[in-house]
């Protein structure tokens, strides 16, 4: 059974929505419009609203991007062919995979306890992997297996519990709509009843856990929560959820990535009481010297910083597919952040003013999407990011929510 407290939180959020917001929502999506009143867009930024008509497939990867990938792989061109071969050799592409759904997924801090957490994340990644395999090969066995996995979970899952529930929900909830978008809009074998049930799962099990964000957590949490919320909103074609999540995302990014134009020190998370330099320094893991590209989690470790960087690029990519280009708004933060972390990941000496002269590296396979957007499409030189990205190719998966991005985004002009 779902936990009563979670439904109480969701019910409270629903009652908080203004009548205007409810009447503005499409009738078919009124129950989700539901999340809460939208956060204001960052001061001075242009208003960006959900598209009147959603583009499908349109979560992280678009049809033109998928067509480009298929052409490159079939031409045995590199680095795409090596990336494809890597994906197809992984356990996620197996046609004998058996999904392991459960009604309640319980995830504690640092995976203690881990009751279905790995199973859920990896089944969601497998569904996405298989959807890519389907599109590239046009072998219906891969689409059928992806559908089996998605149907297995939508028939069973009811709740996420324990302290890591929001992050777990965000990670799996980022992968599911990528898979579902590709299968729903490029394959004819997924029944309308199954599609409806899957959408209900995303709406009723996933969204309540993530849509309201998490103000005082480390930034990667809320960024991933908004990535999942935006992907889900595209699949559901829910403009109100899209707007809500995008506003919260745009407000969070400046509290995660600093640039000197922000002022003497970074912004605190929107809605928080973190606003003095001392409070910000404490929230930024004790760092008190701020330079272009520094992240709120740099001095924690590069792994969690990478989660946030990846979520930022994923959201920007999805919204671009939906007709809004966030990259001009994000480009300075993202290019400086990718460059700074790539530089030290590559081995440059760490100055004493940065995290006390000690960094915990491990950025992960998270640079391809942002690098492709800024360098390939926008022509911005990114020497260190390019070196690290090319050195790490083919980028695999972090087994959480990032997968196969050399395949999907390396030098992809679309």
PLM-predicted stretches and their roles:
Residues 29, 216-217, 303:
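Short acidic, glycine/proline-enriched loop segments that cap or flank alpha-helices
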Residues 1-38:
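Secretory targeting and sorting signals
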Residues 240-244, 302-313, 317-321:
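Active-site-proximal binding-pocket segments
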Residues 41-217, 223, 227, 247-253, ...:
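Extracellular glycan-targeting catalytic surfaces
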Residues 228-232:
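Amphipathic alpha-helical interface segments
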Residues 135-138, 233-237:
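Hydrophobic/aromatic side-chain positions at a characteristic register within alpha-helices
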Residues 257-298:
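Flexible internal linker/loop segments at domain or repeat junctions
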